[in-house]
Amino acid sequence: MLDPFCFLKMYLKERVEVKTKSGEAYTGTLEGFDEHINLMLTCSSVEGSEDKVLFLRGENILFVGPRLLL
């Protein structure tokens, strides 16, 4: 099984999709993370609105994965 920190390092500076426990979906470029899996996304968007920088608290994150272009 892949260590979560190794997984996140693979996606640094890449477009990712993040789902939260409350059901929200965010997309953006993963700029950084810490030991609590708090994430910093840039050029992020959620449900049609865009922000330059977004911070997501690790305890609220359900999953992180590559942004799939469909």
Swiss-Prot record:
It is found in: Nucleus. SUPFAM superfamilies: Sm-like ribonucleoproteins. Residues 3-70 form the Sm domain. Keywords: mRNA processing, mRNA splicing, Nucleus, Ribonucleoprotein, RNA-binding. Pfam families: LSM. One of its GO terms (biological process) is RNA splicing. InterPro entries: LSM_dom_sf, Sm, Sm_dom_euk/arc. GO terms for cellular component: nucleus; ribonucleoprotein complex. It comes from the Eukaryota. SMART domains: Sm. GO terms for molecular function: RNA binding. Binds specifically to the 3'-terminal U-tract of U6 snRNA. Belongs to the snRNP Sm proteins family. This is Probable U6 snRNA-associated Sm-like protein. It comes from Encephalitozoon cuniculi (strain GB-M1).
